[in-house]
């Protein structure tokens, strides 16, 4: 039997992960990027950009449930939601499950990403692009949040790692723009990497966000594809009570929402804000 090809991730220099490649569905390598989608028996369809896994069919639900349901249920009455990035459609899919949300705006810098993911990752969006509340804006995220006249109750930054095109979504200009178009009491969240290996990302985001929001922190989830420990999500708001809601309050909102989840539940919600001591110490040691 012929040995299967292997695809090796190149995110870290000293160690990493690999996937056996059952079938390459798409591969484009240009001077600007290397994009591949392949099938793997354990994780289904896998999409990687420039040597870094972006999403897989098998475990994407963990990431997307935690990025959406935590801020939306903590807020309690969000009507207008902004997604920055999210071209694969899975973040949109989870937001559309909240029936009280009235509008969902998604800002994607490349229209081709949306059509590409609709073709190769159809399970991610699961038809959510057809939701009447959804509006797609093709624009740079930093430009949009600093120019739009719209305001939002929850902003979700589904950014890649802070390298290449994704770097702008970790800048002060982006965070300031998000504060500008966030309604009073609103919540901003963003993926912030695996803190054991990418601790400087969390420290940098915490320092920058603290210039614009009075309550800045992180919550976490364990996502197999993003190996090396827990993945952290940045959390920023001016209503510090929202990060400390009881499990009972979240439970009541969860039951009222009618949501059925595979990872998220109210106990996971409240526990997610408990951070390992090494991260707490690193954040506390930074100058104010």
Swiss-Prot record:
Q: Indicate the enzyme's highest-level EC class.
A: transferase
Pathway assigned in UniProt: Amine and polyamine biosynthesis; spermidine biosynthesis; spermidine from putrescine: step 1/1
InterPro entries this protein is in? Answer: PABS, PABS_CS, SAM-dependent_MTases_sf, Spermi_synthase, Spermidine_synt_N, Spermidine_synt_N_sf
GO molecular-function terms, A-Z: spermidine synthase activity
Q: What is its main location?
A: cytoplasm
Q: Name one GO biological process term.
A: spermidine biosynthetic process
EC numbers on record: 2.5.1.16
Q: Which residues form the PABS domain?
A: 9-238
* Reactions catalysed, as given in the entry: S-adenosyl 3-(methylsulfanyl)propylamine + putrescine = S-methyl-5'-thioadenosine + spermidine + H(+)
Annotated residues that bind S-methyl-5'-thioadenosine are located at: 33, 108, 140-141, 165
Positions annotated to bind spermidine: 64, 88, 158-161
Q: Which domain of life is it from?
A: Bacteria
| Enzyme active site | 158
What's any one GO cellular component for it?
cytosol
Sorted alphabetically, which keywords does the UniProt record give? Cytoplasm, Polyamine biosynthesis, Spermidine biosynthesis, Transferase
In the record, the note on similarity to other proteins reads: Belongs to the spermidine/spermine synthase family.
- Described function: Catalyzes the irreversible transfer of a propylamine group from the amino donor S-adenosylmethioninamine (decarboxy-AdoMet) to putrescine (1,4-diaminobutane) to yield spermidine.
NCBIfam families the UniProt entry points to: MFS_SpdSyn, PRK00811.1, speE
The entry's protein name is Polyamine aminopropyltransferase
From which source organism is this entry? Answer: Escherichia coli O6:H1 (strain CFT073 / ATCC 700928 / UPEC)
């Amino acid at each position: 039997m012929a040995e299967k090809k292997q695809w090796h991730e190149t995110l870290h220099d000293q160690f990493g992960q690999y996937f056996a490649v059952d079938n390459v569905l798409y591969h484009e390598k240009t001077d600007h990027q290397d994009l591949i989608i392949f099938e793997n028996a354990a994780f289904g369809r896998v999409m990687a950009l420039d040597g870094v896994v972006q999403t897989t069919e098998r475990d994407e639900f963990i990431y997307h449930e935690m990025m959406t349901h935590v801020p939306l249920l903590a807020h309690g009455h969000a009507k207008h939601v902004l997604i920055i990035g999210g071209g694969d459609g899975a973040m949109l899919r989870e937001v559309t499950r909240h029936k009280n949300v009235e509008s969902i705006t998604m800002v994607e810098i490349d229209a081709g990403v949306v059509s590409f993911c609709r073709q190769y990752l159809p399970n991610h969006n699961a038809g959510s692009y057809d939701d009447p509340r959804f509006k797609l804006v093709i624009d740079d995220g930093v430009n949009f949040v600093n120019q739009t006249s719209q305001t939002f109750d929850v902003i979700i930054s589904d950014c890649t790692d802070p390298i290449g095109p994704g770097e702008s979504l970790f800048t002060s200009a982006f965070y300031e723009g998000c504060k500008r178009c966030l309604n009073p009491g609103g919540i901003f969240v963003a993926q912030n990497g695996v803190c054991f290996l990418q601790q400087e990302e969390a420290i940098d985001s915490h320092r920058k966000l603290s210039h614009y929001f009075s309550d800045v922190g992180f919550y976490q989830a364990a996502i197999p594809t993003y190996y090396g420990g827990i993945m952290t999500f940045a959390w920023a708001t001016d209503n510090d009570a929202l990060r400390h809601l009881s499990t009972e309050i979240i439970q009541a909102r969860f039951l009222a929402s009618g949501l059925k989840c595979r990872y998220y539940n109210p106990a996971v919600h409240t526990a997610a804000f408990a951070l390992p001591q090494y991260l707490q110490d690193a954040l506390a040691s930074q100058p104010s």
